[in-house]
């Protein structure tokens, strides 16, 4: 909206608005501040309303009885606090992002769509007073629908051509460097850039610490890329959901993971920095950076009330959606494997559950961990909740640093 306002004031009222307000860096800062302040100042009113509506959290006791004792004080703490986070982010989106860019549309649809799924999941848990909620198949189906829509836009020429023709949304412009070597000295000559199509862009698979794509899909093999997109979005969404089990744990880990992707999105939108790092120049990826800044601000504001002892939980409304936003952002930036590094805590949490279930079924009910996800295992070992959270935050920060460093060490 800020860009519309600037254009209107300059075109209709002939007022000269400082160009600083159109800079990506400025809008990133303003988006973070907006969502942070909204989360903090609306938090008390929102939490009070949740108490009045008796939207309390149920505690998992079935397969980990000790959790009922450890988390007894958390019983009936309000949940669905993700509504506060998502609302703050969407306000920032409307105020500070370019509403004509396709990345803005994709991130908006992702937030609303996954927010509704998470909200439905929380509603069923509250209705039946248990921790089951929606069936796993039901959630996977809707996550597949979202992933299929995003994959179709990038991989099917007819779909993105339709958007270019019939909508006002600007497609991203992607350029790669062409490095020429002198045949005699074998030294690299000044690089040039060439534009690549959305389909070619989306068909490439990049791995951290490697400059060039390791695989480029084409033809029928594009189906594999579509399933890979589904795996990334669904995996990140559900992994974040599994991580949301201790006061402040997920919010803190989201800040570091989103911060890493935010930095990558910002430098990908800068011609000179992209050339220096020898990465793809993605015109418009700054919009992703703005939204991730809004996510960071909203998460920090929510952490104000979600830190130990938590006054509110984000619930699946927040965790499923925020994890999905990270996954979608990684897909848009073609940094899916990098997300596996910067979101290392999410990967560890998800793997702990997968290994625990597999071991229980295949090894005659033998368990690898005392309790899964991983953070509960350390609780069972006697670690205080705050110590588990802080140590996981430290590891999350370490993973984020490694992920960012991979851009330089290619």
Swiss-Prot record:
GO terms for cellular component: plasma membrane. One of its GO terms (molecular function) is UDP-N-acetylmuramoyl-L-alanyl-D-glutamyl-meso-2,6-diaminopimelyl-D-alanyl-D-alanine:undecaprenyl-phosphate transferase activity. One of its GO terms (biological process) is cell wall organization. It catalyses: UDP-N-acetyl-alpha-D-muramoyl-L-alanyl-gamma-D-glutamyl-meso-2,6-diaminopimeloyl-D-alanyl-D-alanine + di-trans,octa-cis-undecaprenyl phosphate = di-trans,octa-cis-undecaprenyl diphospho-N-acetyl-alpha-D-muramoyl-L-alanyl-D-glutamyl-meso-2,6-diaminopimeloyl-D-alanyl-D-alanine + UMP. It is a multi-pass membrane protein. Its EC number is 2.7.8.13. Its main location: membrane. Belongs to the glycosyltransferase 4 family. MraY subfamily. Catalyzes the initial step of the lipid cycle reactions in the biosynthesis of the cell wall peptidoglycan: transfers peptidoglycan precursor phospho-MurNAc-pentapeptide from UDP-MurNAc-pentapeptide onto the lipid carrier undecaprenyl phosphate, yielding undecaprenyl-pyrophosphoryl-MurNAc-pentapeptide, known as lipid I. This is Phospho-N-acetylmuramoyl-pentapeptide-transferase. It comes from Protochlamydia amoebophila (strain UWE25). The gene is mraY.
């Amino acid at each position: 909206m800020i860009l519309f306002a600037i254009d209107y004031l300059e075109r209709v009222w002939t007022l000269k608005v400082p160009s600083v307000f159109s800079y990506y860096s400025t809008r990133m800062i303003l988006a973070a501040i907006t969502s942070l302040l909204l989360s903090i100042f609306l938090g008390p009113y929102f939490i009070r309303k949740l108490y009045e509506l008796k939207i309390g959290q149920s505690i998992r006791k079935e397969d980990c009885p000790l959790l009922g004792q450890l988390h007894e004080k958390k019983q009936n703490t309000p949940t669905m606090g993700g509504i506060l986070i998502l609302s703050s982010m969407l306000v920032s989106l409307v105020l500070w992002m370019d509403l004509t860019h396709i990345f803005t549309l994709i991130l908006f649809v992702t937030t609303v769509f996954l927010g509704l799924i998470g909200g439905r999941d929380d509603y069923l848990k509250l209705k039946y007073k248990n921790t089951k909620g929606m069936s796993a198949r039901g959630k996977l189906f809707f996550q597949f629908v979202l992933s299929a829509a995003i994959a179709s836009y990038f991989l099917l020429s007819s779909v993105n051509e339709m958007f270019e023709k019939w909508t006002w949304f600007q497609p991203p412009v992607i350029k790669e460097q062409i490095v020429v070597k002198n045949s005699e000295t074998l030294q690299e000559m000044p690089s040039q850039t060439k534009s690549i199509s959305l389909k070619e862009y989306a068909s490439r698979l990049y791995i951290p610490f490697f400059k060039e794509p390791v695989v480029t899909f084409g033809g029928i093999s594009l189906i594999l890329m579509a399933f890979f997109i589904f795996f990334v979005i669904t995996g990140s969404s559900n992994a974040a959901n599994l991580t949301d089990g201790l006061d402040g744990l997920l919010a803190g880990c989201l800040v570091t993971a989103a911060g890493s992707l935010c930095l990558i999105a910002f430098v990908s939108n800068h011609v000179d920095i992209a050339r220096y790092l020898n990465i793809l120049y993605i015109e418009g990826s700054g919009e992703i950076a703005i939204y991730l800044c809004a996510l960071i601000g909203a998460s920090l504001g929510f952490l104000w009330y979600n830190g130990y002892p938590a006054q509110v939980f984000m619930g699946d409304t927040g965790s499923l959606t925020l994890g999905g936003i990270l996954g979608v952002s990684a897909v848009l930036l073609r940094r899916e494997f990098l997300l596996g590094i910067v979101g290392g805590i999410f990967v560890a949490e998800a793997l702990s559950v997968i290994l625990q279930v597999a071991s229980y079924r295949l090894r005659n009910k033998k368990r690898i961990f005392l309790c899964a996800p991983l953070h509960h295992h350390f609780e069972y070992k006697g670690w205080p909740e705050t110590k588990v959270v802080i140590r996981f935050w430290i590891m999350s920060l370490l993973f984020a640093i490694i992920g960012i460093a991979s851009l330089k060490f290619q």
